[in-house]
Amino acid sequence: MKALSLAVFVALTWVLDAQQTGALAQPGIKWTEDQLRQAVAPARVGRKLTPKSWPGNARVAVCLSFDVDNESYLLARGETSPTTLSAADFGAQTGLPRILGLLDRYQIPASFFIPAVSAIIHPEMIPAILKSGRHEIGVHGWIHESLAPLEESEEERLLKQAIDYLTKASGKRPVGYRAPAWAFSARTLGLLRKHGFLYDSSLQAMDEPYEIVSNGEPTGLIELAIDWTLTETPYLGRGGTMPSPELLYQLYKDEFDGAYEQRTMFVLTLHPHVTGHRAPMRHLDRFIAYMKSKPGVWFATGEQIARYLKNM
């Protein structure tokens, strides 16, 4: 009951924060030690899952992942400007075909996390992704909705809609999940367990795979952790801070080299409406070529990595 009360309190706080302009809300300064512990308890690090070896005695597992948002995140907040929507439509019309062509050239798999509405608007995308037989479809919300303000019943309804649509469109029930905007609510983890997901790829507590613990209980759910340094939108999206994709891909290379040395996992998250432009694609091409040049690199989908870890 205490945990539920805190979850409601936190959700209300987020809603109030969103309504404020210019005011910095700091509700946590008044929380008790008990409330602070409860606030962080829903999703914590459990067992580290980096194996002694990857398939084929590879040194590193590489998961290239793409969040295929397109117009969904704009539609979620009621944006209908044709100009604004056209910039997101670029992801389906141009970015995704370029990315699939690049992956075909290197014959490597990837995981595509798709808001169901994105696939509804662009029904040609899922068949194109699945054509090679190498790639995975994962859940990325219904309409790239913000989860925190939702009631649990509404969050579950949207999750079920997304699962059902993507299952029907792809012919296979997705086993991987990535939260819209990578932002869980206090209820999301419980819903993922309830609906039988194999793994999540939304959290950022480590740069290696781990089992998620919830309120002190091992969940059996595998986390393929991501990080804001390993995606392009903060740098190349609107309001981004990176002057050149070349600098961004140097960061990715250094992160990959570290994962290679540590014999663990490297997860890169990109967006077709951003990375699909000419300059980022040139650097992505060079980066994949660099990783392919190294011995002992296992390119895999999130599902392949998670199943390998599950069966250890």
Predicted regions, residues:
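Bacterial N-terminal signal peptides
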Residues: 5-17
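Active-site clefts of carbohydrate-active enzymes
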Residues: 229-232, 264, 270-273
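Surface-exposed cleft-lining segments at the edges of enzyme active sites
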Residues: 174, 235-245, 272-273
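Catalytic alpha-helical scaffold of carbohydrate-active enzymes acting on polysaccharides/glycoconjugates
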Residues: 27-176, 181-223, 246-268, 276-312
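Boundary at the C-terminal end of the N-terminal hydrophobic targeting segment
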Residues: 18, 23-25
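A structural motif
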Residues: 217-235
